[in-house]
């Protein structure tokens, strides 16, 4: 048995998320289909993050279990990558132990991109367009209310019937303008739950616009209303999984994929 850790990137706009589904096109489904096309057998995969429909990734980590040893592993991985649709790419790979836990991460970093400038036709799939200029400093100040350990039940898509923990820690949030003058809201933490970052982002914007107060946000964190969630949830296409880090250094092999 051979265990590999892949780093993959994808444009998630046209996909129904990471997790494989019977009647929908997903990233995991396309990856396993590509492996099957090369190996002619089902290959088991597990992603570090279950990105939602429409969400992108620059560094999704995927654990792959092979029941055989390819003679030229780098060539094999590159062939699989070339078999994938053009909006999914394998960036690199590394051998890992059988007991490696792909979801036991040290930190995940997501970034949500907002365009408060002129409409950008060629990047509209990767950003949320707003019609008025925003103050980065004010957005950053509002965002800090969510830093730390809180019960995020009100700011996540968790159903009352689901047994999912909602108390988690966000280590850091920061807001900046990138080189293209777009606004980026960065979220760094170990665990994020369904829709959490999108809901936090839209609540930051709602607070900025005066639709909800900081006092209300604080109350919803300290004592979340039972069985209810916020009505504010940002569009998925502005969100990207930027990076995943583990407790120990995992050095992925990028060179061989490039030079072969």
Swiss-Prot record:
List of residues binding substrate: 110
UniProt-annotated catalytic positions: 52 (nucleophile)
MF GO annotations: RNA binding; tRNA pseudouridine(38-40) synthase activity
Catalytic class of the enzyme: isomerase
Keyword flag Isomerase: yes
The name this protein goes by in its record: tRNA pseudouridine synthase A
Pfam families assigned to the protein according to its UniProt record, in alphabetical order: PseudoU_synth_1
Enzyme nomenclature, EC number: 5.4.99.12
Organism: Spiroplasma kunkelii
Record flagged with keyword Nucleus: no
UniProt family annotation: Belongs to the tRNA pseudouridine synthase TruA family.
CDD domains attached to this UniProt entry: PseudoU_synth_EcTruA
Reaction(s) catalysed (UniProt annotation): uridine(38/39/40) in tRNA = pseudouridine(38/39/40) in tRNA
Function: Formation of pseudouridine at positions 38, 39 and 40 in the anticodon stem and loop of transfer RNAs.
């Amino acid at each position: 048995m051979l265990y590999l850790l892949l780093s993959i990137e994808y444009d998630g706009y046209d996909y129904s998320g990471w997790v494989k589904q019977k009647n929908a096109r997903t990233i995991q489904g396309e990856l396993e289909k590509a492996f099957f096309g090369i190996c002619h057998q089902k290959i088991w995969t597990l992603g570090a993050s279950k990105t939602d429909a429409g969400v992108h990734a620059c560094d999704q980590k995927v654990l792959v279990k092979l029941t055989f040893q390819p003679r030229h592993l780098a060539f094999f991985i590159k062939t699989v990558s070339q078999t994938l649709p053009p909006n999914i790419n394998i960036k690199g790979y590394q051998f890992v132990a059988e007991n490696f836990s792909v979801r036991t991460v040290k930190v995940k970093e997501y970034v949500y991109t907002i365009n408060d400038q002129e409409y950008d036709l060629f990047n509209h799939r990767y950003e949320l367009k707003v019609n008025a200029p925003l103050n980065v400093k004010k957005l950053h100040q509002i965002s800090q209310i969510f830093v730390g350990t809180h019960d995020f039940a009100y700011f996540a898509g968790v159903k009352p019937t689901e047994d999912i923990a909602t108390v988690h820690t966000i280590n850091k949030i920061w807001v900046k303008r990138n080189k293209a003058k777009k606004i980026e809201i960065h979220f760094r933490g170990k665990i994020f739950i369904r829709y959490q970052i999108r809901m936090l982002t839209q609540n930051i914007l709602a607070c900025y616009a005066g639709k909800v107060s900081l006092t209300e946000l604080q109350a919803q964190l300290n004592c979340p209303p039972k069985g209810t969630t916020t009505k504010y949830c940002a569009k998925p296409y502005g969100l990207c999984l930027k990076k995943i880090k583990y407790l120990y250094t995992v050095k992925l092999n990028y060179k061989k994929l490039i030079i072969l």
